[in-house]
Amino acid sequence: MLQLANRSVRAKAARASQSARSVSCAAAKRGADVAPLTSALAVTASILLTTGAASASAADLALGAQVFNGNCAACHMGGRNSVMPEKTLDKAALEQYLDGGFKVESIIYQVENGKGAMPAWADRLSEEEIQAVAEYVFKQATDAAWKY
């Protein structure tokens, strides 16, 4: 799913880049300075490529919530941790103890491999489910949406 999102974002960025060239050509024909315009559009395309590709779709988040509720909530209901209460799933806690920092990839690694009392889930969940639950946990933590 994320690969499809990446393709969509790349297509949008390519269209933005093409539009920038068209606008720049038209402005240049009128003798206008096109450097600031071209630069601004390039920055916009870059932002689309870096932020849009990492965002999860509503369907991905719904699957992530379903996987979380069916597999993770026994220990992590509402973002808590019933085994080690200090290691919640809020952003500040995840920033402290995730190997690799607070990012989806670090959550994926921990879900796949486990750590401490947390078991590895790579043999029980599909790659799609792990990706979705990692994006869900990341989004919940980023938005401070866990309900304690």
From Swiss-Prot:
Its biological purpose: Functions as an electron carrier between membrane-bound cytochrome b6-f and photosystem I in oxygenic photosynthesis.
Protein name stated in the entry: Cytochrome c6, chloroplastic
Binding annotation for heme c: 72, 75-76, 118
PANTHER family per record: CYTOCHROME C6, CHLOROPLASTIC
Binding partners and assembly: Thought to function as a monomer, however 2 crystal forms are observed; a homodimer and homotrimer, suggesting the protein oligomerizes.
PTM comment text: Binds 1 heme c group covalently per subunit.
Key words of the record: Chloroplast, Electron transport, Heme, Iron, Metal-binding, Photosynthesis, Plastid, Thylakoid, Transit peptide, Transport
Reported induction: Induced in copper-deficient medium.
Gene Ontology biological process terms in this record: photosynthesis
Entry-linked SUPFAM superfamilies: Cytochrome c (SSF46626)
Family named by the database record: Belongs to the cytochrome c family. PetJ subfamily.
The organism of origin for this protein: Chlamydomonas reinhardtii (Chlamydomonas smithii)
GO molecular function terms listed in the Swiss-Prot or TrEMBL record: electron transfer activity; heme binding; iron ion binding
Location in the cell: Plastid, Chloroplast thylakoid lumen
